[in-house]
Amino acid sequence: MYVERIPIEVPTRAPTGRTACYVLGREEALLVDPPAPDERIEAELDRVGSVAVTHHHPDHVGAVAEYAEAADATVWCRRGRAEAFTPATNATPDRVFSEGTEIPTGGEPVVVRDTPGHAPEHVAFETPGALVSGDLAVAEGSVVVGDPEGDMRAYLASLRRVVGLAPERLLPAHGPEIDDVRATCERLVAHRLDRERRVLEAVEAGNRTVTDVLDAAYEKDLTGVEDLAGATVRAHLEKLAAEGHVRWDGARADPA
């Protein structure tokens, strides 16, 4: 399938400072994650038939309404998430998708794959040989999975699921394409499990608040990203509590 990748500078916490949107197919194409108006997207609108997003974060949805109207395109939304989709995008969905839905293009359809974790509605779009993966994975560094929307257990399950799908490459929203899918997903799983271990050790050592756990579990300088790191610690504590390893009431953590 023909894939056009268009990286666009937008206000984002991602290190690249850009979000890539994708045009999938040559005719009646699917436009994925248009983050902001851009003349390169506008040049493709005459062949766009549908618009969808991997999830609702602002750096992925900024031009959904504008380009759906300009292309007279079908707007797709995750089933059960329309109430969140409309205020995020200023667009009303025409159709809904769920796991396995085939979104038609002029050629082969694009298949929806559930990949929650980074956000509850997060999906990926499967084309022959590639998976448009949104914020599921990055070639370098890690992905923020932060409370309240982030679900660490779901995120790890999504990474493992993608390994099982075995796409030839991942097409992420931030950073370069990912050719070694298995190695990247396994690296991200290992990173999260190592952070989880550090969080658990911090709680067992007597740290009770998110701030205290943060100081104990992170060795690097968190200047400018303390809020993201704190949200990540809370997501780890939610997972550890669900699995019976700690007691966590949203403010205080104790060993189980």
Q: Where would I find each of the regions flagged by the language model?
A:
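Conserved beta-strand hairpin/beta-sheet module of binuclear metal-dependent hydrolase folds
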Residues: 1-44, 123-139
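Active-site HxH/HxHxD metal-binding segment of metal-dependent hydrolases
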Residues: 10-17, 34-107
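Divalent metal-coordination and catalytic microenvironments
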Residues: 24, 33, 55, 97, ...
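Hydrophobic residues in well-ordered beta-strands that form the structural core
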Residues: 32, 75-77, 133-134, 172
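Metallo-beta-lactamase
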Residues: 109, 114-196
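C-terminal regulatory/interaction regions
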Residues: 204-256
